[in-house]
């Protein structure tokens, strides 16, 4: 996935390769020549998601599929409003990638009156359903995630 991140960042003019030697907090990959650029990478069988930001960011994408009962129980949360299981899953994963904190089984997200309520005041999170067959989420503590995802053609990534 580092190649995907490098390809997308190169296509966007950043031209830097990420390093995965643990120099960033929690061993997270980073761009040594451009430390002010933050990114988060996720993939599933059918999609890859790379979030690039001027502030720390967490992103996750999951392919929607039937849930085993044990997984459904793991995702259960008493007060999550109308969040669907994969929305909750991707939000929790993206939050964990952003902060490195919390228990993936219990990170508290909910939707109240149509508004996403993240686990920490001031956090900015968004759920995306525009990747066919997938759900994605992005979380930040400083920048509002974009309203829509920007799709990058594979030929721009793999050249």
What name fits each language-model region?
Residues 1-159:
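Core catalytic alpha/beta fold that binds nucleotide/phospho-ligands
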């Amino acid at each position: 996935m580092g190649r995907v991140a490098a390809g997308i960042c190169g296509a966007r003019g950043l031209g830097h390769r990420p390093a995965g030697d643990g120099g960033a907090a929690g061993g997270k990959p980073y761009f040594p020549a451009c430390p002010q650029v933050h990114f988060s990478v996720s993939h599933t069988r059918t999609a890859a998601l790379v979030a690039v930001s001027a502030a720390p960011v967490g992103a996750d994408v999951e392919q929607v599929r039937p849930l085993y009962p044990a997984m459904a129980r793991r995702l259960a949360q008493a007060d999550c409003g109308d969040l669907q299981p994969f929305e909750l899953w991707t939000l929790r994963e993206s939050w964990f990638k952003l902060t490195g904190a919390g228990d993936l089984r219990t990170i508290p997200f909910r939707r109240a009156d149509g508004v996403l309520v993240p686990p920490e005041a001031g956090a900015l999170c968004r759920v995306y359903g525009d990747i066919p067959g997938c759900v994605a989420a992005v979380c930040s503590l400083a920048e509002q995630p974009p309203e829509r995802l920007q799709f990058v053609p594979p030929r721009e990534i793999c050249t």
